């Protein structure tokens, strides 16, 4: 479940209407795809979750696992704040400690600025969810 949530958050940053929506690891291996309807698939195209336009994040069985609010606040399924996504791509936990960064070019970095992945065709906010649901 932890791995699913991590990947789901990472994928959630994808734009639902982009044509090439993918998540890659630091070595550029594809680890996930996001379809135009918000379905999230792993590298083997198995459905692992869903992201809805309203910010609701669900697992493969449509159980809600979290929420991305319009102001960048991230909540778990129990509506507890687990973090914040800043407009500049800085990702913070609920205590405002920096967890990582999502750059405008799609590079995803940890708190020490090490590259941990790449996103293509995915909104920064959705990619940042990786830090909260892993």
Positions of predicted regions on the chain:
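Long terminal segments
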Residues: 2-47, 53-55, 61-64, 70-72, ...
